[in-house]
């Protein structure tokens, strides 16, 4: 659907060249929700602006449906932009227009007949749950309602692609969840390809099928959501994942670890999370199990959990228990000070 091929964007600043995007190669499949995460200045927003040619790449090509959009004429580019909807962190609504007027605006620009505009806007108002707010002005709406208007407006021209630029960053946690659920509904019912950028890993966790991590203009890691979360390769990705899955031992727990114990990280995936592996080794081997820390989350309907445990007992019995555990779960010995 969307392909970035060795794309770079270079800016000149104070006589120096700055790579906002550097040699990025990515593919976004039709109908998927693809997240791009990174800290401020990573190049996320620049990459999004390249998709609808608000910025042009310095090098490389960008294709949509196998067509190079960097070579489009002005007329072709105008048609392309009608296929791309966009929602923003700051909503970008017209304060002088009603909710109805804001949603109708892109349809008027496209010279859609009035009766069709009314029908389409009413359909979208119902879809985003704002049927009773058609004649309200933005100042009368909450942040979540404003973003619902933004989503409806972005959908007005029946686009194939929806770009989300930090769409939930200005919202409280409860409203963020509501908007993410609405975006999942958009993806599901309209089969829309969604490309979103964020600096919040919990947003990626809740909604994305695949994710790319950007740092200093480069994509440093990319893959399926489950793979990136459960096997993060770079330090930056590991830090993002830890904002959702905290696997560090608290100091208060570290202080309680008895001398001579051995600490292991047990990783459970899917059906493994329901297996009573610890009670089994406690019953069948002369080993005491001290659970130090643990968590479990759901990623794309698959459970993923971590446990940090201390095993105490004779070394021979511990080794037998470890041999059994390795057959059941992923197992790694950790140092107490590194946990």
Swiss-Prot record:
Pfam families from the UniProt entry: ABC_tran, NIL
Membrane topology label: Peripheral membrane protein
SUPFAM superfamilies in UniProt: ACT-like, P-loop containing nucleoside triphosphate hydrolases
Keywords: Amino-acid transport, ATP-binding, Cell membrane, Membrane, Nucleotide-binding, Translocase, Transport
Cell compartment(s), UniProt: Cell membrane
GO cellular component: plasma membrane
Transmembrane segments: none
Segments forming domain ABC transporter: 2-241
Reaction(s) the record says it catalyses: L-methionine(out) + ATP + H2O = L-methionine(in) + ADP + phosphate + H(+); D-methionine(out) + ATP + H2O = D-methionine(in) + ADP + phosphate + H(+)
InterPro entries: AAA+_ATPase, ABC_transporter-like_ATP-bd, ABC_transporter-like_CS, ACT-like_dom_sf, MetN_ABC, MetN_ABC_transporter-like, NIL_domain, P-loop_NTPase
SMART domains hit by this protein: AAA, NIL
UniProt-listed Enzyme Commission number(s): 7.4.2.11
Quaternary context: The complex is composed of two ATP-binding proteins (MetN), two transmembrane proteins (MetI) and a solute-binding protein (MetQ).
Similarity-based family: Belongs to the ABC transporter superfamily. Methionine importer (TC 3.A.1.24) family.
Function: Part of the ABC transporter complex MetNIQ involved in methionine import. Responsible for energy coupling to the transport system.
Name of the featured protein: Methionine import ATP-binding protein MetN 2
């Amino acid at each position: 659907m969307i392909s970035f091929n060795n794309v770079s964007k270079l800016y000149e600043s104070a006589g120096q060249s700055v790579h906002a995007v550097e040699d990025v190669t990515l593919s976004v499949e039709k109908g998927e929700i693809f997240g791009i995460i990174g800290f401020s200045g990573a190049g996320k927003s620049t990459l999004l602006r390249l998709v609808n040619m608000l910025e042009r790449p310095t090098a490389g090509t960008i294709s949509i449906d196998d067509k190079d959009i960097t070579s489009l004429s002005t007329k072709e580019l105008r048609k392309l932009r009608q296929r791309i909807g966009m929602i923003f962190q700051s909503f970008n609504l017209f304060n002088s227009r009603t909710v109805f007027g804001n949603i109708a605006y892109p349809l008027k620009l496209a010279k859609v007949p009035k009766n069709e505009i009314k029908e389409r806007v009413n359909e979208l108002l119902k879809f985003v749950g704002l049927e009773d707010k058609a004649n309200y002005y933005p100042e009368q709406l909450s942040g979540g309602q404003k973003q619902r208007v933004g989503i409806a407006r972005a959908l007005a021209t029946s686009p194939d692609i929806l770009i989300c630029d930090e769409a939930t960053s200005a919202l409280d946690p409860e409203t963020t969840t509501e908007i993410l659920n609405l975006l999942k509904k958009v993806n599901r019912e309209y089969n829309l390809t969604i490309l979103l950028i964020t600096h919040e890993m919990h947003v990626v966790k809740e909604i994305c099928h695949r994710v790319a991590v950007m740092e200093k203009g480069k994509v440093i890691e990319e893959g399926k959501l489950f793979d990136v979360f459960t096997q993060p390769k770079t330090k930056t990705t590991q830090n993002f994942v830890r904002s959702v899955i905290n696997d560090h031992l608290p100091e208060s727990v570290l202080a309680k670890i008895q001398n001579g114990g051995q600490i292991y990280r047990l990783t459970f995936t899917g059906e493994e999370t329901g297996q009573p592996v610890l009670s089994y080794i406690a019953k069948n081997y002369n080993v005491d199990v001290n659970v130090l820390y643990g968590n479990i989350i759901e990623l794309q309907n698959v459970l993923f959990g971590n446990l940090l445990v201390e095993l105490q007992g004779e070394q021979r019995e511990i080794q037998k228990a470890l041999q059994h555990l390795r057959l059941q779960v992923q197992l790694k010995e950790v140092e107490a000070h590194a946990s």
